[in-house]
Swiss-Prot record:
Residues 30-200 form the Chitin-binding type-4 domain. Probably interacts with GlcNAc residues. May promote attachment to both epithelial cell surfaces and chitin. It comes from Vibrio vulnificus (strain CMCP6). This is GlcNAc-binding protein A. Belongs to the GbpA family. It is found in: Secreted.
Length: 485
């Protein structure tokens, strides 16, 4: 068997790769197309300003809805027809009656326009339409469509121009329908699939007294305290008299689709010359949980509607979390040192000052920190004497304005040689329930304390780790229960 030269193999490989990579396109309405594809409206707004939202990554590459060849015998699986099984386009497979912008159409001769970002040899284009009784709230499947294309255009196995238009005879339908346009590339095993969401309006406009002037697009979630409102413009400019405001006063309303629906409902309740929602079969404006078109009454002199927001900006929070401070430090040969940890909330400067009970400053540190930062601080006291001490922590913002101050108490105690065990009955709080009048205990400060006689002896047993007011030597009311020996 004769081997093919390596150079020839490389050339064949490159031609296959380039054929797939270079051929891209989408259904447009730039010149004379009747309607844009679903994916096209993810990137480009329609002439009415309407646009599809929450499309995912495909909004940046509408030309790339490419999938396996051979629909309907093969090609994309049911439920994946709109995305052509492309991971970029998964969102396009969502299918409900109110999910996508619908473009008006009528039965009869209509132009379908393709825009190619890279044209390529073409086998043909085919156009399919949903059955009259299809269910718009189920994923698109072969059963949704009349599988006999209503229009087939031969590509002649040549490159088309960068923009091409096909005149097709669209069948009679009513209401919301989906047209599937398939571009079969001639020299690859791939095709491009574009679904077009359309609405049949009969022989004339369904509501001649109304025209679209904007839309409510649920572009973002809001917060409680925010407000979303309409900005209505007439021939003279913005007219506040027509404004509709919706206060976001519950967690439910913070969700984008929910406030879009609620604002549309409020417009319909409060305005006579403005309506919002998608038009149903009874020519009624029905607010939906998604994009809601806004319509203006003819003769009202109103020109357009925009959406505005009042965003509540929460006041910045400044704080510091202090860790590592003990309730008691023993005085030894070296000066007492406090090893502390700080964690910042907000961009702050923390000032730390240690005072003794006589309000003498013994140590000071200033620490600049950014939001979320952790820092370790060591503070060595200038003198170490037994007794009550205080750590004062001040939190300043970037302008040096005091935002918070807190005081933490701690004790310094002399290091003592423990007395002989026969000088006391218990090491406090061991044996707590046995304490009676004259019971002697060794306290945490190294001193021995004796429980007072009745009626004060009852205080000696009143202690828990969180209720220490009668703790001998250190509690706030220890002298009511104990005598120091």
């Amino acid at each position: 068997m004769k081997k093919q030269p390596q150079k020839t193999l490389l050339a064949i490989a490159l031609s296959v790769v380039s054929g797939t990579a270079m051929s891209h396109g989408y259904v447009s309405a730039v010149e004379n197309g009747v309607a844009e594809a679903r994916v096209t409206l993810c990137k480009f707004a329609a002439s009415t300003g309407e646009k599809n939202t929450n499309c995912g990554a495909i909004q940046y590459e509408p030309q790339s809805v490419e999938g396996p060849d051979g629909f309907p015998a093969s090609g994309p699986r049911d439920g994946k027809i709109a995305s052509a099984e492309s991971a970029l386009a998964n969102a396009l497979d969502e299918q409900t009656a109110d999910r996508w912008v619908k473009r008006p159409i009528q039965a009869g001769a209509q132009n379908f326009e393709w825009t190619f970002t890279a044209n390529h040899v073409t086998k043909d284009w085919k156009y399919y339409i949903t059955k009259p009784d299809w269910n718009p709230n189920q994923p698109l499947a072969r059963a949704s469509f009349d599988l006999t294309p209503f229009c087939v255009v031969d590509g002649g196995m040549v490159q088309p121009p960068k923009r091409v238009s096909h005149t097709c005879n669209v069948p009679e339908r009513e209401g919301y329908q989906v047209i599937l346009a398939v571009w079969d590339v001639g020299d690859t095993a791939a095709s491009f699939y574009n679904v077009i969401d359309v609405k049949f309006d009969g022989d004339g406009p369904a509501l001649p007294d109304w025209q679209q002037g904007g839309q409510i697009i649920p572009t973002m979630n809001l917060n409680v305290g925010d407000t979303v409102f309409t900005r209505v413009f007439d021939l003279a400019g913005e007219n506040p008299a027509y404004t509709t405001e919706l206060a976001i006063d519950s967690d439910a309303l913070t969700v984008a689709n929910n406030w879009s629906h609620a604002l549309a409902v409020k417009i319909n309740q409060t305005q006579s010359e403005i309506a919002a929602g998608q038009l149903n079969e009874q020519n009624q404006f029905v607010p939906v949980y998604g994009t809601n078109p806004i319509f203006l009454k003819s003769g009202s002199n109103l020109q357009r509607v925009e959406i505005g927001y009042k965003i509540e900006t929460p006041a910045p929070e400044y704080d510091v979390t202090l860790s590592g401070l003990a309730s008691e430090y023993q005085i030894g040969d070296a000066p007492v040192t406090l090893d502390l940890g700080l964690q910042a909330t907000g961009d702050i400067t923390t000032e730390l000052t240690i005072y003794n009970h006589h309000k003498e400053p013994l140590a000071f540190e200033t620490v600049a920190m950014t939001d979320g930062e952790n820092k370790a601080v060591s503070m060595t006291l200038s003198k170490s004497e037994a007794g009550h001490h205080m750590l004062v922590t001040k939190v300043l913002d970037k302008d040096g304005t005091l935002q918070k101050q807190q005081t933490s108490d701690f004790m310094l105690t002399e290091t003592q040689t423990p007395p002989p065990s026969d000088d006391y009955d218990f090491v406090f709080p061991d044996g707590l329930s046995s304490y009676t009048a004259d019971t002697k205990v060794l306290a945490s400060d190294g001193a021995i304390y004796q429980c007072k006689p009745f009626p004060y002896s009852g205080y000696c047993v009143q202690w828990t780790p969180t209720a220490t007011q009668y703790q001998p030597g250190t509690g706030s009311h220890w002298q009511m229960a104990w005598d120091k020996l």
